Amino acid sequence: MAILTNSVSLLGKVGKYKECKCFETGGMVTTINFGVKTGEKWNNFFIDFFNTKTRELATEVGDNVKEGEWIQIKGRLIENKFTPKHLEGKTDENGNPMTISQTKIVGFDYKRVRYNEELEEWEYIQ
């Protein structure tokens, strides 16, 4: 399995979906739906936030981030390539093993923002 990691910064609106999961190991992940508008079109993403040794980000997002808020997310794009059972042993037209690629966004920070019409720019909310 290959993993490709990049850095991204997205500004958008928090959607309705939010799910918090706790693991037997004591870890936690919070997943939110996040909408980014490009022109007249909205693109939706699912962003995962995890608790770490230095910051309980999943707990913070689960408790404090609300539907409809504008936030800026900093995170990483993580691409997982894997071969599901139904494709095991199969190859494409070039003889390469068939795989599926799945891209996820893992957030490592967020900040609330608002649009200042007077200055015509986004600003952070404390």
Q: What are these model-predicted stretches?
A:
Residues 1-126:
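Single-stranded nucleic acid-binding surfaces, predominantly the OB-fold ssDNA-binding core
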